[in-house]
Structures are given as structure tokens and as C-alpha cells.
Amino acid sequence: MEEFQGYLEVDRSQQHDLLYPLLFREYIYALAHDHGLNRSILFENAGYDNKSSSIIVKRLITRMYQQNRLIFSSKDSIQNQFIGHNKNLYSQIISEGFAVIVEIPFSLRLVFSLERKEMAKSHNLRSIHSIFPFLEDKFTHLDYVSDVLIPYYIHLEILVQTLRYWVKDSSSLHLLRFFLHEYCNSLITPKKHITFFSKGNPRLFLFLYNSHICEYEYIFLFLRNQSSHLRSTSSGIFFERIYFYVKIEHFFKVFFDNNFQCTLWFFKDPFMHYVRYQGKFFLASKDTSLRMNKWKYYLVNLWQYHFYAWFKPGRIDINQLFKYSLDFLGYRSNVRLNSSVVRSQMLZNLFLINNAMKKFETIVPIIPLIGSLYKANFCNTFGHPISKPTRTDSSDSDIIDRFLRICRNLSHYHSGSSKKKSLYRVKYILRLSCVXXXXXXXXXTVRTFVKRLGSEFLEEFLTEEEVVLSLIFPRTYSTSRRLYRGHIWYLDITSINDLVNYE
């Protein structure tokens, strides 16, 4: 019991109570906008004194709490012209600074946790592609997978209550409550409001969303560890914090008084893998369908009865891994069963042995990718290249460099694909779209433009690995076939390419 209590309790020494006064510090807004600390963020008028920034912040906060925000005096609209351009501008300015402030307790807690545990601080950036070698190694031994969309909180007040155990300043919590209702304007959070909120203030949205996800993941990790002899190992960092003390005490009561441990014992699964990405997560396990269904209803009950998030059990599908394709980070991944027949003969008896080998494959989903190219005006709905509108003063070299950079980024991102044929089609679209855009900017025909540039223009669209490998290996059929089927994972990619982010 003491061991579990120590696992769940949080040291209060790193909790700071006074965050609201930081809103009146100019450097907070400099950090929020990545500006220099000696530059004013709230206004561009040189006639203002920098010392009056706190007064402007006070005026903005006062205006936010007014019932009718559209009524401004003519004098104020002249002196504060930046307020009249957009009715949500003053709210957005304060919310961007507030997003920096609420991150402070979590950042201090993380630093304190690393120092207390004497963990080596890694300054290397983690690559998105580092997850794929892990999946190639683990998924071939698993049988079932569930792809789940993480539910949002129904009531906005739950997000505020989540942060109460970190942010003790009531003024900051009231301001956060105002921001949530300002953007969503409803007790129910539809997807369109969440999308608008994420675009209006992505930093604050990501902070609230990650705190919501970390809340349920921490309890799920705790209960998962009690359900198996093997402790789970995580490749990420979980913040140790207070997770609804009343609910934690309820967990202890159920766990120890109602023989809950025996119930979890039936869920024992030492081969479960949990991966979260883009508002979704999937559970993969080497287990029976019955136990996967038990974990399914267990998660639903955890969300509904302990986190008040409405979630239907029918939205969680349990699929056999070799029959299911997983859309993951711009790839479509699946496990294929490749059969190999071995003929062996012992004396006069002939034996045929059929072995089924599992292979993890990652392919490029060409239809969604062409849809992204269509939205970016590189091609039409059928995948035919078109001229992308460009600035009239752009030179040919600027247009070509921009297309080359897009093509190189896509090639690097999808270099781990099992089949490169669809990737070559994307290169073809970008190459001809570049020619059409440059010819339109130069008021010439495509034929004339290509003839003027020569064959060197086409060679520039080769990626770095294709150029290097073509110099090392001879141009034989077997070599080109191996390069076509080979996986090349770039371990320096830290963000999802915009064209592969279909959602």
C-alpha cells in the first residue's frame, strides 16, 4: 500500500501559486512570439512607452470580461487601433501569453524530476521515424490491434479541474475558464470549435490537450502495471503529478477492498504495446480476442465513469493484425504473411513444409497523398499536374528551389516505404507542376522552358540517396530492384510533413 501511495503522490514543493502577475510582464509575450526581449509585442506604435505595457494588458483583460466587447469609444479606437482590427485579437494576445505561463509549473516539475532521479538529459532530438524500426521488430510477433480515437471531454470545466492541482492561482484558473468558453462558446465541444481553438492558439490548445491525455495515461499505466507480472517500460516521460485525489482514493478502495486485483489478474498481458499519435492510439497485443475485448470495455469504463468522457464501445474495433492496415504518420502499415515451402527428403520419404513468415510493411497511401497535393494546388483531382499560382516577381531559380525542397522533404519522409512506385508518381506530379508554374511565370510554353533548362533540370529532382547510391552501385537490374524495395529511415525527422498530415 505504501509503495502504491508513493507512486501516486506528488511533491508539492514545485507548485507555484502566483502565476497571474506574470501576465503583466512584457518578456512573457516576447517568449510567446519568439521576439526579442527588448521589443514590444502588444503594439507597433513608437509613441508608446514600453513601461505602459502592463496598463495595456490590464485594459485588455478588462475588455475581455465586458459583456459587449464590440462597443468601443472613438477615442480608444484611435489610441488602440490594434484592438479594432479583430474582435478576438485582444483575447488572443492574452491567451498566447497565458499559454507560456501555465507551462512553467510543468517545466519546473520535469527538471526537478530529472535531477532527483539523476537521469541523463538527452539533447538529441527524437525522430518520428524511430518508431518504425520498433514496430518492425515488435509487431511481427503480435496478433491483434485496436485503433482508437481518443475522446474529448464533454464539459469544459473538467479541463479546468484537471489543472487545479498544478495551478493554485484562482485568478489564472478563472482566466483559463474564460478562454475556453470564449473559443468554444458552449458546454459541448464540437470538432469545429476544437479546430478553431487549435488554430487560434495552438500552444494553449496543445498544453490543455496533453494534460488531458496525460491524465488518463498515467492512471492507465498504473493499473496496467498491476495487471501483469512484467512491468511496462516506456519510451516517453510521464509526469508524476496529482491525478484527481478522490478518484485515486476510489481506485485504492476498489483495488484492495473489492478484490479488484483478481479481476485485473484476468487481464494479464505481458505483450501489450501502446502507441499514441495525432489524437489516436492503438493497442497491439499477442493475446486472445476475449482478453482484448475485456481491455476494450475496461478502457470505456475508465473514460466514462472516472473521466466523464462519453465513449461508445462500438467505436473500438479489434482486428487481426495480418488482416488490418493501420494508417500511421503518413504511412499505411500492415503485417503480411509470406509463405515459403521447403522440400526435404529423408531416405525415400519426401516432406513439404510450409512456413508462414510475418513481415511488417509500410506503404505510401497514394490516394490521400494526391488529395493533399490537390488541396495545395499541385494537381487536379485526377492527379494531373497543374500550374501552382506563384508570385509574379519570383525568379525561375526561386520556383525550382521551392519545388525541390518540397520534393526532397517528401522523399525523405516516405523513404521507408516498402514500395517506391507511388512515391515516384508524386515526384512526377511535383516536377511537371514546377515546370508549368515556372513557364507561366516566365510567360513561355512548357516545351520552351524545358528546352532552355536542359536535362540537368530533371536530374535535380533526384533525392540525395538516389544520387549517392547510383554512384556507389552499378546500374544493373538487380541493384535497382533492391533499391526499389529497400527501407531507408531518416532518423532526423522531428515533425510531420504538411502534405502527409491528411486530417
Swiss-Prot record:
GO terms for molecular function: RNA binding. It comes from the Eukaryota. Keywords: Chloroplast, mRNA processing, Plastid, RNA-binding, tRNA processing. Usually encoded in the trnK tRNA gene intron. Probably assists in splicing its own and other chloroplast group II introns. The keyword Phosphoprotein does not apply. It comes from Thryptomene saxicola (Rock thryptomene). GO terms for biological process: mRNA processing; RNA splicing; tRNA processing. Its main location: plastid. Belongs to the intron maturase 2 family. MatK subfamily. This is Maturase K. It holds the Pfam family Intron_maturas2. It is found in: Plastid, Chloroplast. InterPro entries: Domain_X (IPR024937), Maturase_MatK (IPR002866), Maturase_MatK_N (IPR024942). GO terms for cellular component: chloroplast. The keyword Chloroplast applies.
